[in-house]
Amino acid sequence: KNFSDVYPDKFTNVTNGVTPRRFIKLANPRLSDVITEGLGTDKWLSDLELLKGLIPLADDDEFVKKFAAVKQANKVDFSNFAKRKYGFDIDPNTMINTMVKRLHEYKRQALKILSVIADYADIKSGKVSADDIMPRTIVFGAKAAPGYYLAKQTIQLINNVARVINNDPDVKGKLNVYFPWNYNIELAMNLIPATDLDEQISQAGKEASGTGNMK
């Protein structure tokens, strides 16, 4: 702060951001093509204000069909990637519900897995019929600091819950949980384009930037 007071012109604040060139053009070329077709230009890649031109297309049935087809194709691609890379059997016809972010108490991955446990318990107790729920696949992606014991315990909990749920025939095809290891850019570029529902439930006032949802 002292240096900033003396040399204010030498300091600037740049928050976290997301590059559309990587997370749309490179990671999601199908969506990129649909956007370019809808806008009639690819200049949106360097001027995201142009994306406002998509708003009227939300009521265009043909555009919506193309958008939905892109999402389904991406889900199939991710399912194949997950099988090849991790041995996971992910059904691309289920809703893919993701929570990808640094593992931390304030980001509340523990709260999310507790909600999954509650849903599972409701099905097993007969309180809710498995046939009445939206078939969903929950995918966690995260890393924890080496010495962060509670975060490591949360990862263990998620994997233990996944092991139970994924091997229970009562919820087969209705509820599945996966935690692919070593979350990295390769996984992000395959998972994010396939995501139907992205969870952002960090404790209010704690999230510094929150770029995961932008991707």
Kindly label every feature range from the protein language model:
Residues K1-K215:
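Catalytic cores of carbohydrate-active enzymes across secretory and cytosolic contexts
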